[in-house]
Amino acid sequence: MGRQAFEFGLRPKDQFKVMQHFDLNTNHLEVLNRLYTPLIGTQAVGLYHFMTQFVKESHNETLILSHYIFMNELKINLLEFRQQMDLLEAIGLLKAFVKHDEQETQFVYQLIQPPSAHLFFNDPMLSIFLYSEVEHRRFHELKKYFEYQQIDLSEFKQVTRQFTDVFKVPSTKIDIDTSDIPINEPYQGIDLSNESFDFEMLRQMLGKHFISQDIVTKDAKRLITQLATLYGLTADGMKHVILNSITSGQQLSFEEMRKQARSYYLMEHENQMPKLQVKSPATSSSAGKSSEVNPKPQSDEWFELLEQTSPIDMLASWSESEPTISQKTMVEELIEREKMSFGVINILLQFVMLKEDMKLPKAYILEIASNWKKKGIKTAKEAYNYAKKVNQPKNEGSSGNYQKRGSYYGQRNRISKEKTPKWLENRDKPSEEDSAKDNSVDDQQLEQDRQAFLDKLSKKWEEDSQ
């Protein structure tokens, strides 16, 4: 997994627009379906197709597009959406732009024109990754599909008319403003701008073999970076590749460089070609940042994380399963109707789950939400402190009014028997009058059950904070 859904503060209500400076034709679809699907999967390619419908709608300033569309129509949460977007961005088919202000966050997604089959198969990284995914026979079947019989023109002479042979040259010069006409941005391949290669060391090594540094042109540098990234070559390994790829005219053969680099890799890796693999959460950049922060429960960083995390993603993490449609609808209702922040909703849902044996009764949740809204609770920290406060036991007189309504305040004497989260375990001790009513045997068993639950819950909080 790459970036988390909350890395850019991505929320369901955030608006988006889609840009596309080309016309998607059947050739593009063939390349996407046949060549890119084995690399990034059907979900990512399907998301690319799905987003094309919003290009024209994005020109309508009165039409508001939000990320609820992806969640509702594709039946995915924002974390899954971000994972598929990561694949499209990394493979070079999409660019993402974001703008934050005090009121809202807006995203612009730019669809990039897929390359031609010729460019795809000539890309040293894409072609190798495809070969690794589909193996030898299927790779050549795909390649053959895009081939066509060319007419041999070697014995023909071109007799095409030039423009000036047919038309008069205009004498009047007209200045035309074309700044508003979008430029068809071609496919640039896999972006390796954040990858570095020691070209200075390579230059020194080649100099010892009396090889001119002029041989490493701009295009050669691009290919060297691609091959070094693909095959994990150092400056010394690249030196051997280059020395074996120089033609009799003292020029670099790019085709030979690719062959030499491939052979070098195969010898080092028991004839196994490199595969396209998605980084695991432990090695991804976003996970690295998360591990550095590693917020502890009740810390400012922990509250900030709750404010940024989608409640749907939180539910998926807590229950280790996809939230149901009714649960997603309930979260959307809390956001839209009650205007609650992510942090408040996350505290609310965790509060209810831990008190209701991991269940989420909608009526109960909406009643709490309504009360919290009336109390003016707007942040995760405020919700946390208030949840601790209302969870404290109350005597018979003070709780009687709430018992009739079945409110979440009406904990009465059974409060000490409720399942309690770690951050709610510090309560006021019950009064002597209340304690006298309890049976000592029941108290002992209750304390054992309570401590066992708190031990289990503490472990859960520690796991979630990592």
From Swiss-Prot:
Stretches assigned to coiled coil: none
UniProt region (DDBH2-1), positions on chain: 200-292
Pfam families: DnaB_2
Start and end residues of each stretch annotated as DDBH2-2: 293-401
Species whose genome carries this gene: Staphylococcus aureus (strain NCTC 8325 / PS 47)
Lineage: Bacteria, Bacillati, Bacillota, Bacilli, Bacillales
Function per UniProt: Helps DnaI load the DnaC replicative helicase onto single-stranded (ss)DNA. During DNA replication from the origin of replication (oriC) in the DNA replisome, DnaB and DnaD are required after DnaA and before subsequent helicase DnaC loading. Component of the replication restart primosome, which reloads the replicative helicase on sites other than oriC. Essential for replication initiation of the chromosome and plasmids. Remodels DNA, laterally compacts supercoiled plasmid and linear DNA.
Subunit text: Homotetramer, higher-order oligomers are induced by ssDNA. The DNA replisome assembles sequentially on oriC in this order; DnaA, DnaD, DnaB, DnaI-DnaC helicase. Part of the replication restart primosome, PriA binds first, then DnaD and subsequently DnaB bind.
Region (DDBH1): 3-113
InterPro entries (UniProt xref): DnaD_dom (IPR006343)
Family designation: Belongs to the DnaB/DnaD family.
Name of this protein: Replicative helicase loading/DNA remodeling protein DnaB
Keywords, alphabetical: DNA replication, DNA-binding, Primosome
